[in-house]
Amino acid sequence: MAKVYYNGDVNEQVLEGKTVAIVGYGSQGHAHAQNLRESGVDVIIGLRPGKSWDKATEDGFSVYSVREASAKADIIMILSPDEHQPAIYKESIEPELTAGKALVFAHGFNIHFNQIVPPEHVDVFLAAPKGPGHLVRRTYTEGAGVPALIAVYQDATGQAKDIALAYAKQIGAARAGVLETTFKEETETDLFGEQAVLCGGTSALVKAGFETLVEAGYQPEIAYFECLHELKLIVDLMYEGGLEYMRYSISDTAQWGDFQAGPRIVTDETKAAMKEILSDIQKGKFAKGWILENKLNRPEYNAINEAEKNHPLEVVGRELREMMPFVKASKSKGVVANAKN
């Protein structure tokens, strides 16, 4: 079982006299920066010129170029998207990594897959809230917090874990609980969850269900409601109380159908495919493919993305959502991983 730390387990004094630079001011960046500041930490922001720079300035932060912020800071938290981090690091952060500084991540991808290789004289650790930035911020203001993961990759000062815990506490996470992990575990399980269950698995299941009903002659609007729209109702129940609470809350007919049909959908072959997906992640095959795809300017990614936008499920969904003004689509990118970024 994971080791869990709470407020009373943390020595926040290790942050005294230190300046934290938050690189990025998106979903996670604004939450980390504001929570740290309100916890008494000296925070600056590192950005490129643009809307985020203006927003951070409006919020009362001192904003600098990434390189200047990295030079001024003792602790540098990188909250830009995974695919942008290596270039930002190489150009603007690495030259300013003097001995004793700390490099921090909210997702382990670039460290675990060697896209960023820090010098030996700096601490490297993970501080990853398990929720989107707006929730990290809101729960903090309410006196609560979102659980977070910490992991130490490199301990040059002998204080990396203490600093990681203090950072997590000052963004509110130790109010809920901070779980200790490793960069390997966080990275591989995060990618697997996204691919096999949360994004890849769920998207494929929803599309297959929709297509099955439409091909059998049912109206696409009805198929959309049954296979996509109502998914939120079930996921919310799982979120609140696990599978047991979901099953308690649905009808007995639905629960019996769950027991009878579920194993016919997710079969031994499905689990074998999941193991292959996990193996590809563990061996670095997925990472290599994604890195290459980005270097080539994402030809396959963009082609698939455009095709998916025109799937009949999406076409009918856009029409039906016009009937439901209470359904609002957030335009924030990276809500799941980079809940996380």
UniProtKB/Swiss-Prot annotation:
Q: Which UniProt keywords apply?
A: Amino-acid biosynthesis, Branched-chain amino acid biosynthesis, Magnesium, Metal-binding, NADP, Oxidoreductase
What are the names of the required cofactors?
Mg(2+)
Catalytic activity of the protein: (2R)-2,3-dihydroxy-3-methylbutanoate + NADP(+) = (2S)-2-acetolactate + NADPH + H(+); (2R,3R)-2,3-dihydroxy-3-methylpentanoate + NADP(+) = (S)-2-ethyl-2-hydroxy-3-oxobutanoate + NADPH + H(+)
Q: Which residues form the KARI N-terminal Rossmann domain?
A: 2-181
GO biological process: one example? isoleucine biosynthetic process
**KARI C-terminal knotted domain boundaries:** 182-327
Question: Which SUPFAM superfamilies has this protein been placed in?
Answer: 6-phosphogluconate dehydrogenase C-terminal domain-like (SSF48179), NAD(P)-binding Rossmann-fold domains (SSF51735)
| Keyword Metal-binding appears in the UniProt entry | yes
UniProt-listed InterPro entries: 6-PGluconate_DH-like_C_sf, KARI, KARI_C, KARI_N, KARI_prok, NAD(P)-bd_dom_sf
- One GO CC annotation: cytosol
Residue ranges annotated as transmembrane are none
Binding residues for substrate, per the UniProt record? Answer: 251
Report the cofactor remark: Binds 2 magnesium ions per subunit.
- Listed binding positions for NADP(+) are 25-28, 48, 52, 82-85, 133
Residues of the signal peptide: none
Cite the annotated pathway.
Amino-acid biosynthesis; L-isoleucine biosynthesis; L-isoleucine from 2-oxobutanoate: step 2/4; Amino-acid biosynthesis; L-valine biosynthesis; L-valine from pyruvate: step 2/4
List residues binding Mg(2+) 2: 190, 226, 230
This entry's Enzyme Commission designation comes to 1.1.1.86
- PANTHER family in the record, alphabetically? KETOL-ACID REDUCTOISOMERASE, MITOCHONDRIAL (PTHR21371:SF1)
Q: Which family does it belong to?
A: Belongs to the ketol-acid reductoisomerase family.
Q: What is this protein called?
A: Ketol-acid reductoisomerase (NADP(+))
What gene name does this entry carry?
ilvC
